[in-house]
């Protein structure tokens, strides 16, 4: 031992030691024990590259020096993975008692079960985030499309509003012009009407139409004959009506013609004297022209009415 030390010391004396300022300081390589037990957050970094089938590495105990030289890789079986998936669906959080129970049932170490649950939660969160991102992305795209369509509709409506405003302005100008023209026409008409009224007022008033006071005797006679019918219509005597030949002779005799002329003259004289007016009410003279009295009104005093002349 002394020789070895002496030899080593003697060799170290011959070897030159050079200190270069340009060399970078190299950090010491981390030990296995320091990497494994540096903290609880290092588990996620160590198992990020594990496969989805649940492969795990058996790193052995801490105090065994031979574990770093010969690392054995273990893979979980299909049945073990299915059982762990079912338990994860029930509850993704693993308690210590549940961890030990699952390890005993599946033939695994509790640390392996804990690591599998941790990795599975990380993948589940990633998938959940991806699903949420997809939903949000689809909603965003739909909202963007709706916003674009609404923007287009808004632009079209704004254009229509501008067109309507322009039309309203044009129609307003036309309406103002038309109103001005109508007012001018009305003013001209009122001026013309006033001028006509003034002209009529300056003119001399025209005399009223002349109404003739003297009417022809023929018209008066016709009116009297229309008021007083023929005497034959008022005869109610059965003795006179029985003698038809006497009636015919009476109508066509020359005395009858003279009597008719006398009656016409009498009616003309009565009309000129004002005995009967044109506005006599027939209701007041109903008894005057009823029966034999109507027949005797003119015939009693006439010579031709006597039956002795005809009998002789």
From Swiss-Prot:
Widely expressed. Its main location: nucleus. Induction: Down-regulated by abscisic acid (ABA) and by salt stress. Keywords: DNA-binding, Homeobox, Nucleus, Transcription, Transcription regulation. The keyword Transcription regulation applies. Gene3D superfamilies: Homeodomain-like. It holds the Pfam family Homeodomain. Residues 129-164 are annotated as: Leucine-zipper. The keyword Ligase does not apply. Residues 23-33 have a biased composition (Polar residues). CDD domains: homeodomain. Residues 1-33 are annotated as: Disordered. GO terms for cellular component: nucleus. It is found in: Nucleus. GO terms for biological process: abscisic acid-activated signaling pathway; positive regulation of DNA-templated transcription; response to abscisic acid. Residues 69-128 bind DNA. One of its GO terms (molecular function) is sequence-specific DNA binding. Belongs to the HD-ZIP homeobox family. Class I subfamily. Interacts with DNA as homodimer. Probable transcription factor that acts as a positive regulator of ABA-responsiveness, mediating the inhibitory effect of ABA on growth during seedling establishment. Binds to the DNA sequence 5'-CAATNATTG-3'. This is Homeobox-leucine zipper protein ATHB-5. The lineage of its organism: Eukaryota, Viridiplantae, Streptophyta, Embryophyta, Tracheophyta.
